[in-house]
Structure formats: structure tokens, C-alpha cells
Amino acid sequence: MRIRGVKPFASAVGLLLGLLYAVDAAKVNKHKPWIETTYHGIVTENDDKVLLDPPLIALDKDAPLRYAGEICGFRIHGQNVPFEAVVLDKSTGEGVIRAKDKLDCELQKEHTFTIQAYDCGEGPDGGNMKKSHKATVHIQVNDVNEYSPVFKEKSYKATVIEGKKYDSIMKVEAVDADCSFQFSQICSYEIVTPDVPFTIDKDGNIKNTEKLNYGKERMYKLTVTAYDCGKNRASEDVLVKINIKPTCKPSWQGFNKRIEYEPGTGSLALFPSMHLETCEEPITSIQASIMLETNHIGKGCDRDTYSEKSLHKLCGASSGTVELLPAPSNSANWTVGLPTDNGHDSDQVFEFNGTQAIKVPEGVVSTTLKEPFTISVWMRHGPGGREKETILCNSDKTEMNRHHYSLYVHNCRLVLLLRQEPTESESYKPAEFHWKLDQVCDKEWHHYVLNIEFPAVTLFVDGGTFEPFLVTEDYPLHTSKIETQLTIGACWQGGSARMTQFFRGNLAGLMIRSGKLENKKVIDCLYTCKEGLDVQLPEEVASAVKVEFNPNQSSLSLEGDDIESFEKVMQHISYLNSRQFPTPGIRHLRVSTTVKCFNEETCISVPDSEGYVMVLQPEEPKISLSGIDHFARGAAEFESVEGVTLFPELRIVSTITREVEVEAEAETEAEGEDDPTVQETVVSEEIMHNLDTCEVTVVGEDLNGDHESLEVDLAQIQQRALEMSSSNVGMVITGVNTMANYEQVLHLIRYRNWHTEALFDRKFKLVCSELNGRYISNEFKVEVNVIHTANPMDHANNAMVQPQFISQVQHASVDLSGHNLVNTHQASVVPSAATIVIVVCVSFLVFMIILGVFRIRAAHQRTMRDQENGKENEMDWDDSALTITVNPMETYEDQHSSEEEGDEEEEESEDGEEEDDITSAESDSSEDEAGEQEDQQGSSRQQQLEWDDSTLTY
């Protein structure tokens, strides 16, 4: 018998039991695993096993339940941790930490990270897994002695003096790359070479075991090795060279005999590593003098090599200075015959050998000098004979031999003769001033300046003043109308018409300035060298050493009692050349030293040290002149007051070319590594410097002053402190100034010609230079052509012609420059007499063709009008009185059209096909003129002459 309701009851009971079982199961994994809070481990590099303290064991209170009480794994936290944790036994929770890859102690000695244990959850799927807290793990990597010692240097050198035993000659040092203290330390060094008188300690100090003998051995070569504390020997032994010097000799050490100076680099230290070897002798004081010998450079040293007149201006001298020994030029040619000693790197000087003399032209210096006045000159003169040697002399030109004023040398004395002009009083007055000077006969260059303000005369020699030791008196000169002659290098004897008292030596920069004395500042500036010695005293030794210079800084003297401070000052002595383009060559250098000791008997003697400064050749600037070199202008422009500008777009550019080293990285195809190589590249660099002369010269016939000239605005010249001189061969602009200022002045030079009938072209040449001709530009040649315009044949008839029927001859190129000139060499048009004749003939021929065509066209129009019976005519022409006059010399509108039409006209002349060449350009030109006329009349419709030449016969 089945009981109803049992089945539903059983289901309810089963559901209840399932819920109870689920709740029970949810409480199975109740606890988290547990591990220690900190672990310390050790691992040896190149091994993966880590020894942990304490061991890695995770515990779970849910044990021994399966899953919930088991440890399934460990998880490591941290970035780039080179370790992993592995479970060895799930039930016991035992695990290990091991390295993923081989470790390197040299890269990292210690590693720190965190670790966490997790159980297996409540079943195989790991559900409801629990994690322990995070524990910190510190692992130290133990070193392996895998590296050998390596010496810091590839080789070692030392120098010792014979006969001495040293505590330490030198020290060698090796390093080991191992990371541990034990294996990275060098425990010992060893000299491998047998039977040598040297030993080495554990710190690498080498010393000699006996006194060394220079005669026995001048150099020892030792092989040294090293051992680390793990007994590893150095991978490579090192070579040690010990030089033996003879017994100590006091001298300056670290002195380079050759010192190269590159222009433009400022000051150069001469003795940067210099020190005094005293051989351990106690020194109480020391003195030294440093001499820079520059007497062979220029006039005693390196100075700017501009003309003496330019140098006076640069030094601030006022105007009125006259240069009596200028460089030969078109405007100053009286020095042409004199031998010169100029290499363009230095000043231009004139040589007098006792047979040459020159006469200064009249007008260069006034006959009677206004007082006060100044005479200045550079002179080099050796011991002479008993004869007087005249530098400058102003004497009677004819009849008599009176010397009005004279500067001469006699028995190593410099003498100024100054005779007074006739006066009412006949009393004695000072006439001769004598100076006895060593400089007059020492064969060296010296600068002499005489400031004369009668009766006082002041002499400056190399910037220093000298008083005359003797002054003699004489009567004033007698009244005479005889003219005087100014000579240089001898004195003119007017009575016998010959030269006498010839000079033997060298002169340069002979100047006279009347009306004003030269001030001391200008004199010092003229004499000051652009090169010399310099010293920047360190503050700590400035008071310990006394330093003195001579006036031109070619020598200095030092004095002190502390050797260390003295050496520091010596190391700061430098050579300086402030010129942009210095004179290259050798400057000898000498250091002379004296010392004082406590014991004078055994005091040392320091020999002189000698060397030289080699001033290298400066990069030579290339001065380039460029611009429009060919153009044409109408004759009217040449005849106008303004004239024609010769250099409207002139550009002056200076460049230097130098070699520079460039590092280039080239990848090797085989290894793919960078292979840096050094390449030399030539680069051109624009620089700025001054110019001192620009000369415009006529190419061809000289200028005819009756009808042509070169002109420039003198106010603009003076505003830029320049000077201009002109002659029939051209124009010279002088003065030290910037390239930009010279450019502006050259833009203003104009050529005028007020009789151009027979002139068709003129050619000019421009050359600029720097440093008195040391650097010269290219020759910039300019050709200007004259465009002649023919006179109209009949102005009245020409005015009557309608513009539609005037065939325009397009404008010949008036200006082949600027925008119209594409290439001044390839596309220039040069009108000439032959060209003008051709244009006239062709224009007349074209005119006849147009006239013939016009008449044929008119006849054809009348025929058509008769056939159309009353039709309104387009045009009605009455040519019975028609006269057309065309100016055959009408200029072309542009150069391009001129060239095209010129080619067409040549083809017409050659082929005889003139009738077929009525071009559309000519028709267009007629139409354009017609349109202009109608615009002026206010017409809204443009009338054009349309030709139908389909029925024309020729």
C-alpha cells in the first residue's frame, strides 16, 4: 500500500540535507596559510640554489584537510626579481627559492623582494583559496673569484737621478672586477724580471735597492704582475720603464723649445708646466728675465703694416701730416727707383746704400715750414764713417749750397740743422741740435720723433724723451729769392748741381707735419707693438713676486724668494699677438735666471733656457669684388651733371678657407658596430676686416681732362675719414676703414664725359687691398657702353602719322644690369658703330615694306567698297599727302625682344625674305599705341586695323 505524500516529504528532507551540507562545506577552509615575516638567503653567483634562514615552510591550521590544509604555491612580488619559489611538499608546506638564471655579483650583490603562500582552496579547482601575509626576503649573492687583476695603465714610466736611493720611485696599481672584498683586493705585486736593482711592496711602490749608475745603465725595463687575495694572477703583466738621469744639474724643467702660436687665438701660455730643478739646494731668492726677440720682425716687432699716414690717423693724429716716403703709386711716384725690403707680410721699408737719393716734388711740403712742426721717421743704421749721412735735407735749388733745414747722422749722433729765415735782427740763434745716442748705430729699428717749437726741440726715441747734449748757434740766412729743393737720402748742392752726404741704412715712415706738435699719446701709439709678453698674476702669489715690463713688453723681469710662487708666475707668462693677420715666423725666447743660497760657496748656477715662438701663417683672406661688370647708358647720362655710376651694385666680401676635422660614424657591414673616423673637410668662412686702399684705373687711354673725369662726393669721403686722390689714370681712395664703408664710397664714384660723339665704350678696373698691399682683391673690370640716339628726320611729319601705322622698333637695352640682366657675361648687348648702321638699314627697310603693304591694302579696300554698293566703309584713307617718318634709332623696350628681333632682322638680310616678316609683335605695338590714343580721346571702343593679306601679291 503506497502512502500518499511520502515522495514530497522525501524531497523536502533531501533539500534540507543539501543545504546543511553546503553550509558545512563553506566552513571547511577557515584559515590562511602562515609563513615567517623575514627570510635571509645566500646564493653563490653562477649557481641557482638559495640557502634560506629560516627554511621556507608554510603552515595552515586547516590541515590535515585535503585542499584546505595543503599549500599549493608561493608567489613572489617585485619587479624584475630573478628568483622563483617552488613547493616541494603540499602537505608539509615545504618550499625552496631558486634563481631563474645565473646571477652576477658584479652587477648586483643583494636582492630584496616579498613572498606570499597560498593554499589549495576547497577543492581541485582551487576555489576559495586563501593567501598568507607577505614576508620579506633578503638574498645575498656570494662572489666567485672569476676575474683577474688588471693594471690601470698599459705601461709606466719614471725618471730617477743616478747616485740616489729613493723611498718610492713610482707606484703601479691594479684593480680586480670581483665584487667581494676578498677577491677584489690586490694582495701582492711582484717584479717578474730577474736580477734588477728594484723591489716592489704590496701597495705597488717601486724603489731601488742600490744606487743607480747612469754610465752602467740608462734605462731599466721591468715586468710587474699582481695577485688578488684569491691568488689569481693579473691577466696581463705591465711594462715599467725607469730612466736614469745623470747627476742633478740645476735648470728649468718642462721647457718646450718650440711653441706654436696660431693667429687669432689670444694669449698663449709659454711655460705651462715649467718648474725649477734646484737639486735640493736651499734657495733664499731668485731672479729671472724673459726676453722675446722680435727685432727681425718688421721694424722691431709686429705692428700694423698700414701706410705711415694711415697709422697716424689710427693713432689720433690731426690732419696735415705729409708722407715723404710713400709706397710707389700713380699719385706718388717719386719713390719708384728706391730699393725696398718688403715681403708684404711686414712694413715697406726703403734701403739706401750710399749712392741713392730722391727729390721730393714741389708742392708736397711747403717751402718754409710753419712753426711748430714735427718730423718723425723709422731708422735702422749701423756704425758709420766720419762723413755726414743725410736723412732729410732742404737746400738751395740753384746757385748756392745753403742748407735751410736738415736731419742727418754723424758719428753715432743725430743732428737737426734748423737755420732761421732772414729777419730784421742779425743776432745768433740756435741752429744745430746734437744728440749722442747708442740707438743711432746699433743696427736696430728705432722710432724717432722731433717736436720743434723754436727754440725748443724735443726728441722722442722709441717713446722716450732725450735732451740734446749740444746746441750750436748761427746767424739767420740772408735774403734770397732762390727756390729750395727737398731731398731724402742725401743733400742737394745747388751750386754744383749734385748730391752729397749720402745715407747708408734703412728708412721708413718719414713724415712732416707743420703747424702742430705731435702729442705723447700719439707717439706711444705709433711705437706700441702688437705682440709681446703678458702675465696674469694669480691672486695668491701676486704679492710674493715682483714683475716689471719694458716699454714694448718684449721682456719682463721677475723677483721673489718663494720658489713655488715663482714657478706659478712663470707658468702664467704668455705670448700675445693682437693683430688679425700677424707676421709669421720665429720669435726667439730666452730665460735667464740667477739664484741666491744660504751657502754662497755651494750655491747653484742655473743656465739660460732658450726656445722660440713660431707664429704660424695666418689664413689668407680672399677679397672678392663682384657686381655689374657690363652695362650701357644713353649719351645724355654721361653728359649730365650726375654722370654714370660705375659700381652701383658692388659687393666686397672677404673669405678664408680652412681645413676642419669632422667625425663621421660609419657602420661596418660585418659587425654592425660604429666605426668613428676623422675626415678633413675644407670650409669657406666669411670674415670681416678693414681695407686701406681701393684704386680705380682706366683701362686703355688715359682720361682727357678737357671732356671727361671720375668724380665722387668728397663730403661722403671725409665723413668716413677717407682720402681721395685722382689723376688722368684713375682715382685712389685711401684710409683704414671697414669694407662696408669702402663699399658705400665706391657706389658713389661717377664717370662723366661731356663730349660723347666719338665715344662708344669705356673700361675701368677696380682693385682693393688691405695692410698696405699684403692682401689684394681680384681685378674687377667694368665696361660701360654709350648709346647714341639719332636725330629725327622730320618732326612735323612724324607728328602727323597715326600711331597705328608706325612700326615700333623696340627699345635697345638701356641698362643691361640689375633685373634686366640675367647673365652679365652671356646675355650682354654691346652697341657699336656696326650695330647702329645695321639697325638703321633694317629699320628703313621695314618702313618701306610697311608703306608698300599699306598702299596695297588701301587699294584693296577701295575695290571692296565699290563692290558692296553703299556699304559703310571701315576706313577711308587719303594718302596723297601721307608722310611717315620713323626714328631708326628708337630703343628696344627690353633686352629679350631686342635679341629676338635682332635675330629675325639678320635672317631677313641673309635670306632676302623681308616681305614675309611683318611680325605680330609689330602689329601688337601698333594696336597698343592706337588704344592709347583712343583712351585719351575718351572713346569706349578700340579701333584696330585688320589686315587681310590673303590676296596680297608681291
UniProtKB/Swiss-Prot annotation:
Signal peptide from the UniProt entry: 1-25
Residue spans crossing the bilayer: 834-854
Species this protein is from: Danio rerio (Zebrafish)
One term of GO molecular function: calcium ion binding
Biased composition (Acidic residues): 900-935
Spans within the Cytoplasmic topological domain: 855-954
Glycan attachment points: N333, N353, N552
Name recorded for this polypeptide: Calsyntenin-1
